Amino acid sequence: KIGASITNKKSIEAANKIFQNFVNIDELQKIASKRISKCFKTESAVITASAAGGLTESVASMMTGNNLDNVYQLPNTKNMKDRVLIQKGHLTNYGAEVSQGILLSGAKILSCGLKKYCTNEIFENTLSKNKNKISCAMYVVSHHCSDYNAISISDFIKICKKHKIPSIIDAASEEYMEDFFRIGADVAIFSAHKFMGSLTAGILAGKKKYIKNIYLQNLGIGRGMKVGKEAIYAAIIGVENWYKRDWKKEIENQNKILKYWLNYLSKERFNGITYEVIADPTGNKINRLRIHVDQKKSNFTIQSLSYHLEKNKPAIFVRDDLIHLNHFELDTCNLKKGQETIVMTEFKKIIAKLKSKEIKHNINQKEYSNKSKKEWLNWLN
């Protein structure tokens, strides 16, 4: 919705520089592979148009191998191993369904366990029984996924290695890229435009033999997901800049914002509003402010607060993934200096309007979800 992170200056400079030149894309991708894999401490890397596109291309590559006839044949998977093994709790939605990203390649999904339950035994038994059909297994690292009674990423990789099944890790929103290769991931997928603040692109890294086959997809279904020279070069600079950053200073800045918000809310004492600082669910070095709304005390719903913050001018977008549980989060990431005060000023204005019923105060979860769908359907109307 908000165009990813704010692009860092060095990535912008890199894009502007290469815009003015012709390049050999194959050679540029080789440079990207060499420089990015060095940062990630793995064998190889390739840049794709997006992490979502990279997911589809990585699955495709596991079916085709280095057989160009197979590459040309997709999404027809005749005579290929075309099953992707994944925990049911990892078939989530990140704006689109993970399942759809897999199916776009022509592959079929082989899910195991329940939405909130999968053991090592269930995963391994499913793998063993279907080994002659499975091309790869996928693990999604995301706050969207259920990690309750799910198998761990380390166990997932160990089981895959035991049965010689390639592993794909979807870690689009993670900041510790090298950790996945340290524990043995064959391929991992990252976003260049999230934490690293580069141009929109996917970064796929891992074992050289798999990365080479991913690159071959540009001759097939990957053609519709091709990446430009500017995103490739900006991703190189974005990754290298990420590993040079002063992360201690970043954490200090985040904590200052959180402290300001906590002090502001403590002074205002909004009726029915409670709050707490929470850590990032997947272990990134980020803390966020979680806002709870008690409708009986506040006389408005949390869905109403979120909706009107977004429709406000200036718009305030919150992390509303778990709003059905009666809370949302305020994120410190990427805020420019002084914007933390704007967030609280507008927060106060919207609450006042909700309390006076100047704006709709009783939006429920169903209405909230439907409003978003209607806006998509009414685009350009």
Please name every model-derived segment.
Residues 1, 34, 43, 127, ...:
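N-terminal charge/polar-biased segments
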Residues 1-26, 32:
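Glycine-rich phosphate-binding segment of PLP-dependent enzymes
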Residues 1-6, 30-48, 52-247, 257, ...:
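Conserved PLP-enzyme active-site core in the AAT-like
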Residues 15-16, 33, 59, 262, ...:
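A generic alpha-helix structural signal
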Residues 16-18, 43-49, 83-87, 292, ...:
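Short glycine-rich or small-residue beta-strand-to-loop segments that form or flank ligand, phosphate
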Residues 22, 144-146, 336-337:
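Short strand->helix junction
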Residues 266-363:
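Conserved C-terminal alpha-helix-loop-beta "cap" of PLP-dependent enzymes
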